[in-house]
Amino acid sequence: MDKSKNLFDLLQDDEEVEKKPTTKSTQAAAAPVAAKKPVAPKTENKVENRSPKLGGQSKPKRVNNGEQQVATSEERQNTKRDSKSYPKHQPRTDATGNIRNRQFDRKSGTGRPHNENKKGGAGQGNWGKEGSVDAETNVATVTPTEGEKESTEPVVAAPVEDKTLTLGEYLKQQGSVTLEAPKLRVAGEGETKNAQWDEFEPIQREVVKQRDTKSVKEEKKTKKNVIQVELKSAPSTQRPKGNTKKVVKGVDVTDVNIFPSLSKA
């Protein structure tokens, strides 16, 4: 075995494709290519979003999820202010797919959707149950047989009596009626000596007098024990503070011996 042989050549299963060498002569012999025409620049139809009330100032375009909304000719006629079309508002839903903040709204208790036909049933505003109208029409369209035609004869209605009264007749009729008071049953009426209760004897019970507790309480309230106590203050043993000199009595001004000029001459 030759050691110089490359072992990785065994991994190449695909057949090798021989590359054809390209020469400059073949490239020159090729047909000339037509000259390219200049491409005109694309002009975008830009819709200017200018408001006539604000002096024609440019504003950013309204974009909904990266898509520009362009108004059609029909939408321009229906709009009042400008030619912009606005997407319809879709309410937000929760994880279950229901509209949010609607769990406390009023709902139909019947479980029927609003689009369901409600003509079945009775009551004011309904048209009866299914099949009732057809049954009435079938009865009306039934044709009687020959035997039934002979038996069905026109029935003459009996004349209705006129029971109306005038005022004078009504007063006479009321005057002839006498009103009697119902008889009242007298006590002991219909009772006999041999009644069902004659065999029994009346029960006699002694009346027990109970002591009145109120009088006892009133007696206790009237008799009260009164104790006379004489309160006296104890004599004071304290001496007066300060100067202990005797106070000299004043002179009698009306004394004639002391003031002789006051005597009568």
From Swiss-Prot:
InterPro entries with a match to the protein in the record: HABP4/SERBP1-like, HABP4_PAIRBP1-bd
Superkingdom to which the source organism belongs: Eukaryota
Disulfide bond sites: none
GO molecular function: RNA binding
Any single GO BP term: regulation of translation
Keyword tags: Translation regulation
Signal peptide range: none
Low complexity compositional bias, start-end: 28-42
GO cellular component, as recorded: cytoplasm; nucleus; phagocytic vesicle
Region of interest (Disordered), residue spans: 1-160
Record's compositionally biased regions (Basic and acidic residues): 73-85, 102-119
Annotated function: Ribosome-binding protein that acts as a regulator of mRNA translation by promoting ribosome inactivation.
Family: Belongs to the SERBP1-HABP4 family.
Designated name of the protein: Uncharacterized protein DDB_G0288133
Organism: Dictyostelium discoideum (Social amoeba)
